[in-house]
Amino acid sequence: VNEDKLIFSGDAFGCFGTLDGGITDSQLNTDKYWSEMVRYYSNIVGKYGPAVQTALKKLSDIEIKTICSTHGPIWEKEITRVIGIYDRLSRYEGELGVVIAYGSMYGHTEQMAEEIARELAANGIKEIVLHNVSHEDPSYILQNIFRYRGLIIGSPTYSNRLFPAVETLTEMIATRDIKNRTFAYFGSFTWAGAAVKHLAAFA
């Protein structure tokens, strides 16, 4: 709406989270929405980074006073921050830090993940997030994969393939075409190391 400098943005600039009372950012404590915006982008919009960049370029010459997204608050005060978050995420620019996502059947791959985390910490990396993919909501795992620059995936071999929850995660990552990550992988096995081979192919 040109005369009001207002845009109805659909899924763009949205976030997860209920509106507890107010509906505009000036009526709400917005602290809880920033991480939920990253989770929302990662899971709903993440595949479309190039399209988001194209849309942001079109908006760069337009004065915007209000953003009405399909999900989340109406943005009035925090427009610059909201656009900045979407700009960074759609460029696939991760923060310094490492996500270790792993599946484990008997605890051995989990032990490896914990040892890797200890070594990373010993080498000065402070932002380290471990995710056991068997027990965690994948939307939060994707959120952190979009957030941080380093990604390490570990899997035991399961029926000559990846552990199912790990395989699902790799498919979700591939669907979103996540770029600009430093990637490593590890695995555990006895008689067949197929999981490591599959992760090497995924890399």
Annotate each predicted stretch with a short phrase.
Residues E136-A203:
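Helix-loop-strand module that forms the ligand-binding subsite of alpha/beta enzymes
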Residues K5-L6, T66, G97, G150, ...:
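Structural motif
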Residues S9, T70, A101-G103, F186:
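Short hydrophobic segments within beta-strands
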Residues T109-A113, A117, V166, V196:
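Short, highly selective alpha-helical patches that border small-molecule cofactor pockets
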Residues L130-E136:
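Short gly/ser/thr-rich secondary-structure transition/capping motifs
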Residues V1-S69, W75-K77:
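Metallo-beta-lactamase
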Residues E114-V129:
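Short helix-loop-beta junction
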Residues T66-G97:
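Terminal amphipathic helices with adjacent charged low-complexity linkers/tails
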